[in-house]
Structures are given as structure tokens and as C-alpha cells.
Amino acid sequence: MKVDILLGLQWGDEGKGKVVDVLTPRYDVVARFQGGPNAGHTLEFEGQKYVLRSIPSGIFQGDKVNIIGNGVVLDPALFKAEAEALEASGHNLKERLHISKKAHLILPTHRILDAAYEAAKGDAKVGTTGKGIGPTYTDKISRNGVRVGDILHDFDKKYAAAKARHEQILKGLNYEYDLSELEKAWFKGIEYLKQFKFVDSEHEINGLLADGKSVLCEGAQGTMLDIDFGSYPFVTSSNTICAGACTGLGIAPNKIGEVYGIFKAYCTRVGAGPFPTELFDKTGDQICTLGHEVGSVTGRKRRCGWIDLVALKYAIMVDGVTKLIMMKSDVLDSFETIKACVAYKVNGEEIDYFPFDIEGVEPVYVELPGWQTDMTKMQSEDEFPEEFNAYLSFLEEQLGVPVKIVSVGPDREQTIERYTEE
């Protein structure tokens, strides 16, 4: 068996949570391979809205194994709050959620460091979520991290050493803070975490594959936030691309099957950083309002713009995408015309590739007729208006990959599969 991978292709917030929930009935295992509680996967069904930050989206399917991989960074306090909310809704986590011993822990001082580093940068700040993600990955790379498996061996000693090191840094930054409440909640989270099964996730996943089990790997954020291939330095601290599933779960490259790339029918971005197709007019405000574009974790209003096919083609290339999934088509239902960026202008020269630095590039647009039809109640591609089919054909021609799934609303039922005869 091979693993299938679901990735965001833009700057995150593409709607991965809903799609994973739609796809999970086809899989035995759902595994999260990177990121932390800085990104939220929003799912909406049966009239209730859920936001998952660290827990894989397969948790809503009663018979699935869910794995938090070694590439994930975990905040015990936030994990406890998230898990208890799910348990209160009737979902049994203890038996079905396994956590890699090699996953790194976000310490209370990591969150303080995150705030201190951002404050020190002033106007040059990245716009982090303040969840301690960057400092945790920094400790991981510098071989100073504390891992889930450390809870079982010499934990107090390792925690104290990390805390002392962080406090020394904070002293140098002259940053005032109070750790007491954060620490209190964190240690309660540690005790709660001990109720879960800690595993060597690389052995577990490869063993499940050997037994013929199907596995879906779930990424957080999006390709354009990848630490290497995103719009650096306005990126996250982990590899969000397809290869991140290999390092974040212990899966060999030849074990990868389908790669689902998910994107919105337009573009959004949260926080600072270049955004070539960003709209600053009433059209941008309209997309934001219709799309309810507010961060599920931060509560921040998202920046909105037209779809960027240059960035999307780049993401498809580095991820090896085999199937595309388009979200939030319904947000554009009322637009008379729709624009798509097909090239950039750099110093007056037109280019069709994603350059080293996208700061200051100008988008080159083509205009397409809108479909001006309410698609939210449609259940089959046979109901798609002619203009929407033309839009899909244009995207497939530009991107070279089929759009297999189209979302026409927030509910899991508002999901239409195409090419079902294949």
C-alpha cells in the first residue's frame, strides 16, 4: 500500500479540514505530519462547527486510527483544551489517537520567546500567531528540544534545562513576562497527555501499510508558507510540502501514492508578507465578507485577492500534485467577471514562473465571465453552469492537473466529485 497526501497549495486556510473529513471514509488511518496549533482546520457538519488545531481530522470517523506524527509540535495545554472539547461532543479520542514519541513539545517559554522575538523586530515582524511554533522548531533544529517521549524519562530535568536556557535569552532581550499561569495550564496538559498512547509513529505507519491499511497524510498551512519554498521569511517553520510527509512521519518517497492539492477559487493570506494578487478595493472586501475570511485560530481578518496561477503552478510542481480540489467556488457566485493571474511583471518584464522574491511583482490578469448562479444547493457536476465549466477547463489547461473535487459550500455535503466515471 501507498499513502495519499492532502496539501494546501496557497498560503493556508484552503479548507483542508473539510476535505479530509470528506475523504476519511475511504481510509483506515489519518496522520498529521507537520505544524502545530498555529493553524486550524475548520469542519462544519450536522449544524455544528469544529476547529481542529493539532488533532487529525479523521477523529470524527469512529473506526479510524489517527496519528500525530514526529513532524508536529504539540502544546499540551492547547491539546488538552481541544481534546476535551471533542470528548464533550461525544468523540472518543483515547483509543483512536496515537502520538509520536518524537513529536516536540511547545513549552510555555517558547510562547514567551515568540512574543519577545516579534516585539524585537518592530515593523519587520513576520506576524506569527504567538503560539511558540518558531522557537520550538528552532530548539528542534539546534538539538535542544523536549519531545513527547521525554515525558517518560528524566522529564523534570529536561524541562528545567530548557526553561533555564529560554529565560537566559529572555533576560538578554529585556522582555517582561509572567510564566505562572501558562506553566500551570501546561503541566495540567502534560498529565492529560499521559492518558494517550505514545508510539514510534514511523514503525506504526509502515506496519499499517504492510498490513494493507490505507493511509491519508494531512498537512497544515500551505505550500506558500513552506520554510524553504514559501515567500521567505514570511513563512512557517516547517516543511509544508509533500516531502514534509516523508520527514514528518517516517515514510519513504516511494510509498507516496496520490497527492491531493487543495486551493481556493481565489486567494487569501493571513499576517505579513508579499501577496501579488491582493485586492484593496470593494471587490476584496466583498470576497472577504462572502467567504467569511477570518482566521479560525487567530481571529484575524484574512487578506483577499484573485487566484494566482503562477504561484499555484509552482506549488503543483514542488508537491507533485496528481489531483486538484477547488474550495469555496460559491464565494464567487455573484461576480459578473472573475480575474486570474497568469504571469508576473518584474521591472517591466513579464515572467510566467515563481521568482526568488515576489515582493513588488505586478500580477498580469486574464478576465473570465462569472457564472452568477447560486451553486450552494447543487449536488452534481451536471448542474454546473456553462461559465463555471469554462472556468474549470481554463484552470485545468493552465495547471495541467484535473480538478477532481469542487466545494460549493461549507458543509461536508456541499462537495461535488468530478470525473466519477474514471
Regions found by a protein language model. Give the residues of each.
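Non-transmembrane, aqueous-exposed alpha-helical and coiled segments at domain scale
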Residues: M1-E422
